[in-house]
A protein has these predicted regions:
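Active-site and donor-binding regions of nucleotide-sugar-utilizing enzymes
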Residues: 7, 11-12, 18-31, 69-171
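A nucleotide-sugar donor-handling region in carbohydrate enzymes
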Residues: 11-12, 44-47, 149-222
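Conserved nucleotide-sugar phosphate-binding/catalytic loop shared by glycosyltransferases and other
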Residues: 35-79, 89
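Donor-nucleotide binding loops and adjacent catalytic segments primarily
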Residues: 56, 191-286
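Short acidic-hydrophobic, aromatic-tinged amphipathic segments that line or gate anion-handling sites
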Residues: 67, 155, 175-177, 269-271, ...
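A donor-sugar binding/catalytic signature common to diverse glycosyltransferases
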Residues: 104-105, 112, 127, 153, ...
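Catalytic binding pocket for nucleotide-activated donors in carbohydrate/polymer assembly enzymes
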Residues: 297-345
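C-terminal amphipathic helix plus adjacent low-complexity
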Residues: 340-389
Length: 389
């Protein structure tokens, strides 16, 4: 540690979670009393995913470690092997790097390994986006498990704050500060967007981003077929696909999308996008089609509709701009047609938005850092609710 500076770490394994945290991280990084380390892992370091860690270097952050993992998403068993590898590597890293506070966002399987390693080393964890529900994916139980390993919590709605408390967390350590992503997308730097993304004709394309459902038993190939069948109905619009994550069976989706793009002149694929470029695409598109959480949390702030497919996001609080459909080509097409008719008229109501979210995250983190040494002297206790069921 350098002098009296508080040492804060942030573990990131994907383009998405880094993008959500970026503005908040900048505030921490600019604070002379904080030494911020970015600990990278997972898909960020993979050549297959475009080595997205370069986006972090480009933004000027200090990357303290690149914890490489063997990524094989062909089965849940292979994902578990990756988690085991991650646990060992994070255990060694945290043994040598005893942070005052570790920031963990969300529910990725790599984050579960990082959280367990940190908790075993008695490193206090601040968990962001806890309490949420996503019944179609193993993120659901991973998220709640990380909550129990964490001492502090920033939730994105009051409903989620109450759920974290229901899990036995002390209300004095659980804060509803809104979702960073719901604010970040309104602060994009359009001057930072160049190339093929900037050349797309505004309001003449769909953004497509979909990931596997890992808990419902729905066939991933059939999911892909249904959405691609629906997209066949829009030859006069550009179809802009965004790279899939590293969940189980994601390579099957990637292969289907690659084949579709190769055979359709109106389709393009971006594996690796800077946060500003992604938000630019959303802002100027007709709607987001797929099952990404950004369609629930970020797209409403930008005033565009979301065609949310399947059960991956089932359980999340959502605004009126989100249209839920099943894995059926006809349903998907009908919702996309409604999105075309409604385009530009939905307003910007978003249940996840709170003004000055990044600043509020920063100020609350300073408050936590001022008491973390005293807090960690005592083991975290289970907070019992005075209710009978």
């Amino acid at each position: 540690m350098s002098g009296d500076r508080k040492r804060v770490g942030f573990v990131t394994g994907s383009r998405a979670d880094y993008g959500i945290m970026r503005n908040f991280l900048k505030l921490l990084d600019e604070d002379g009393n904080i030494l911020l380390d970015i600990i990278t892992t997972g898909a960020l370091l993979s050549e297959k995913y475009g080595r997205q860690v370069e986006l972090i270097y480009k933004d000027g952050f200090h990357v303290s470690a690149e914890i490489g993992l063997t990524l094989d998403s062909s089965s849940n068993e292979k994902v578990l092997f990756t988690m085991s590898e991650a646990l060992g590597k994070f255990a060694a890293y945290f043994n040598d790097n005893p942070y005052d506070l570790l920031l963990i966002l969300g529910d990725r399987y790599e984050m579960l390994s990082a959280a367990l390693a940190a908790a075993m080393q008695r490193i206090p964890i601040l968990h962001i986006h806890g309490g949420e529900a996503t019944y179609g994916n193993y993120d659901e139980f991973i998220r709640h498990a990380i909550t129990k390993m964490s001492r502090y919590h920033f939730t994105s709605t009051e409903v989620y704050r109450e759920r974290v408390i229901q899990l036995g967390e002390n209300p004095g350590n659980v804060f509803n500060l809104g979702a960073l992503g719901a604010e970040n997308c309104l602060q994009m730097d359009e001057e930072n967007v160049t190339g093929e993304v900037k050349q797309l004709e505004k309001d003449q394309y769909f953004v497509i981003l979909f990931h596997p459902e890992t808990l419902t038993g729905t066939d991933v190939v059939q999911q892909g077929r249904e959405i691609l069948m629906a997209l066949e109905n829009y030859p006069d619009y550009k179809l802009v696909f965004i790279g899939v994550n590293a969940d189980t069976d994601s390579d099957l989706i990637r292969g289907m999308v690659s084949g579709f793009v190769a055979s359709h002149k109106n389709a393009v694929y971006f594996e690796n996008l800077h946060t500003d470029a992604y938000h630019y695409l959303l802002k100027h598109g007709i709607c987001l089609v797929g099952n990404s959480s950004s369609g629930i949390i970020e797209a409403p702030s930008l005033g565009i509709n979301t065609v949310n497919i399947g059960n991956r996001q089932k359980g999340r609080v959502r605004g009126e701009s989100v249209m839920d459909v099943g894995w059926d080509a006809a349903e998907i097409k009908a919702a996309m047609d409604r999105a075309i008719k409604k385009h530009g008229s939905i307003g910007q109501g978003n249940p996840y938005f709170q003004e000055d979210a990044a600043k509020n995250y920063y100020q609350k983190t300073l408050e936590l850092l001022s008491r973390v040494e005293e807090d960690r002297k005592e083991p975290k206790e289970f907070y019992d609710l005075k209710v009978m069921v």
